[in-house]
Amino acid sequence: VLYYQGEMKDLDCMNTVGIVGARRCSQDIKKKCYELTEKYVEENKVIISGLAKGIDACAHTACINADGYTVAILGNGLDICYPSEHRILMDRIKEKGLLLSEYPPGTKPTKYAFPKRNRLISAWSDKVVVIAPGKGSGALITEGYARKYSRKIELYEVK
């Protein structure tokens, strides 16, 4: 079962790009994320990410600002905003894109939920872009699933 809020489009026939990476990142890394996201939106790609701090939020924001369609896959119920400071971004995604979760309403985020969320990001993406992942980063879990699912992978190390 998948729960959703927002505008559900036929994602099976769309070109989708998952964008994940560092939660703590410099302005240079965020700039690279914005540039890549804008390029993919110009190519009519759907941007998929996980609403986490850092690269995820940057990708969703850049996509919306470029009038693209973004999907946020959550590691909790749709009625819970995590992280809480992303409430405005979450509301913008509901208006201009799609929130998606395999967790029923009321489900709080746990450390076990995020690797499962990362699995869905890879599964729904034709290509996964990993930007400046740190050691032990959840972005590397997403990359691992992308390899398992034979997805295209782009890795960007930005200093």
Specify the residue positions occupied by each region the protein language model found.
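Glycine-biased, small-residue-rich flexible motifs in mid-sequence functional cores and linkers
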Residues: 1-159
